Regions:
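Generic structural signal for small/hydrophobic residues in well-ordered secondary structure
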Residues: 6-7, 21, 43, 79, ...
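Alpha-helix capping/helix-boundary segments
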Residues: 9-10, 39, 75, 100, ...
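Nucleotide phosphate-binding site architecture
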Residues: 10-11, 41-44, 69, 120, ...
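Short, well-structured N-terminal submotif of metal-dependent ribonuclease cores
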Residues: 1-35, 45-63, 88-89, 133-135
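Acidic, PIN/NYN-like endoribonuclease modules and their adjacent C-terminal/linker elements
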Residues: 1, 26, 101, 105-135
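A short acidic, often aromatic-flanked loop/helix-cap motif at beta-alpha or helix-coil junctions
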Residues: 41, 74-77, 133-135
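Active-site neighborhoods of divalent-metal-dependent phosphate/nucleic-acid chemistry enzymes
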Residues: 57, 67-114
Length: 135
């Protein structure tokens, strides 16, 4: 995996289907696209709340070609360092975003997100957005 897709980017892809994002996903597919197991957990929680078989089928279809990165010991150690650094700097980010960013750091992959403002606070994180502001 070279690119880890954040939860909000996946939501944007499924709900709004912006042409530029879909083109980027196709263009980078061979390079290796994946998601964190944290993102998968967020998705499955949302699907359980929606109670929609159609939504669940769409989610599973979207996730099928993506590599799923398990949150392992290296990610846990990166999380501990990152959370401490952000708290000491007075610039914490949300708990799920901290977990996802830490895993991206541990895997040395680029995080693809529509939430650049939040993730820009993470030192050393490779970060891009494949959507225009307002998507």
């Amino acid at each position: 995996m070279r690119f880890m897709l954040d939860t909000n980017l996946c939501i944007c892809a499924m709900k709004h289907r912006p042409a530029e994002l879909l083109a980027q996903l196709r263009a980078h597919e061979a390079a290796g696209l994946g998601i964190s197991s944290i993102t998968a957990a967020e998705w499955h929680s949302g699907m359980a709340k929606s109670r929609s078989a159609r939504n669940e089928a769409a989610l599973l279809q979207f996730l099928e070609p993506l590599e799923l990165a398990d949150f392992d010991a290296a990610a846990a150690a990166a999380y501990g360092r990152l959370r401490t650094a952000l708290e000491l700097a007075g610039t914490p980010i949300g708990p799920w975003d901290t977990l996802i960013a830490a895993q991206a750091l541990a895997l040395n992959v680029t995080l693809v997100s529509a939430n650049l403002r939040e993730f820009a606070r993470v030192p050393g994180l490779k970060l891009v957005s494949w959507v225009s502001a307002g998507e």
